[in-house]
Design a protein with these regions (language model features):
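Feature marking well-ordered beta-strand scaffolds used for ligand recognition
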Residues: 1-344, 353-355
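Short, acidic Ser/Thr/Gly-rich low-complexity loop/linker segments typical of extracellular
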Residues: 347-348, 355-366
Length: 366
């Protein structure tokens, strides 16, 4: 099933997939795919015929996350091997022996996730370094030999992202997202936190203007939630939403902001596109189900979705069904808003049914 999305292409794998990232070079586009037994680099410039350029065999793991800095791919997993580094320029040029490094000298051998900011700082989450908070490394001096800068180790982070000097982290076992000042990498400080609807905060992403944060809880029946974070002393949840299918027990996984929209990999529901132009009124405006064989609760289907290729195409990693290339039609929602008042007193009224004439839809005033 789909809405405002078009299937463009697919590549199957013999092993299950995990996360995905994208890469662009000289007008060509590539999918970087986490596979159970390694890393797959796929040319998706022609999305109807994706072509694998290279496969790097790694330790077997159902968790494999990857990001890029410049022309390098960085990858971790939860089995072994530390930080894996691939020179993508060599892969694309057809080098038969491209650089592939397994660096186990950085203080960790396993991790759950990574993020790389625009300044070339690598953030490692959920590793076997002490409490598994967030280790920080400089990539700019030598991309093949990261330099340790510092660590936030007050508690475990499952995932996170950084904008400027602010780290937004999913403290999954604490049931909150945390806000960390990382301007001094040797002395990061907590500057805010807030609970999430299902207290199992997996992933979070900040809006382009920096005023709103969007989170997922990786449990059955959870929500994608929006928060006003413009005042860290007074963080407010402003709305929450579940995906399109009607199954209330589906699990959301990773959400990412792309302008006025969030694109969320939603396990058995596939991919969801939500209009966030009004964060206090989240509206789903698109979806694509990559997993027809599964529905409801369960860890199958869409693991990751990457929405930032220059073409606008979305890359999706489906655990069982492989790599999907989807074309979204980003469509803004229509909003009907108002205040229902008592005709005599003029006071606002709650719990009043509002029905759209000619449409099978009704709702209640708050």
């Amino acid at each position: 099933q789909s809405l405002n999305t078009t299937f463009l292409g697919q590549r199957s794998y013999s092993e299950e997939l995990s996360d995905i990232w994208g890469y662009e070079k000289a007008g060509s586009e590539y999918a970087l795919v986490g596979v159970y037994n390694g890393i797959s680099v796929v040319d998706v410039t022609n999305p109807s015929t994706p072509v694998e350029l290279a496969f790097f065999i790694g330790y077997e793991s159902i968790w494999r996350d990857l990001k890029t800095w410049g022309d390098y791919l960085y990858c971790i997993n939860e089995s072994n091997g530390g930080l894996q580094i691939v020179n993508l320029t060599e892969v694309i040029s057809g080098d038969l022996n491209p650089t592939y490094i397994e660096n186990t000298d950085l203080g960790f051998t396993t991790a759950h996730n990574i993020f790389i900011d625009k300044s070339g700082v690598l953030y490692v989450f959920g590793s076997n370094y002490s409490n598994g908070g967030c280790e920080m490394y400089d990539l700019t001096t030598d991309p093949e030999n990261p330099i340790f800068l510092g660590v936030f180790d007050d508690y475990y982070f499952h995932d996170g992202m950084v904008r400027g000097d602010t780290l937004w982290g999913g403290a999954i076992y604490g049931g909150v997202f945390s806000v960390i000042d990382v301007s001094d990498k040797s002395n990061p400080e907590i500057i805010g936190s807030h609970s999430t609807p299902n207290t199992f905060s997996h992933n979070c992403w900040i809006s382009d203007d920096g005023d709103y944060l969007f989170t997922t809880d990786e449990v059955s029946g959870a929500y994608v939630a929006a928060y006003d974070v413009s005042d860290l002393d007074n963080i407010q949840e402003v709305d929450r939403i579940q995906a399109w299918s009607g199954y209330t027990d589906v699990i959301p996984h990773n959400t990412h902001v792309d302008g006025d929209f969030i694109v969320t990999s939603y396990y058995r529901d596939g991919v969801s596109v939500v209009d966030i132009s009004n964060p206090s009124n989240l509206i789903e405006v698109g979806y694509y189900d990559t997993s027809d064989d599964f529905s409801g609760n369960g860890f199958n289907g869409a693991w990751g979705a990457y929405p930032w290729l220059p073409s606008g195409n979305i890359l999706v990693s489906d655990i069982e069904n492989g790599l999907f290339i989807i074309e979204p039609k980003y469509t803004n929602a229509s909003f009907l808003e108002g205040i229902i008042t008592d005709a005599i007193t003029g006071a606002p009224m709650s719990n009043v049914m509002v029905q759209i004439v000619g449409a099978n839809y009704s709702s209640y005033s708050e």
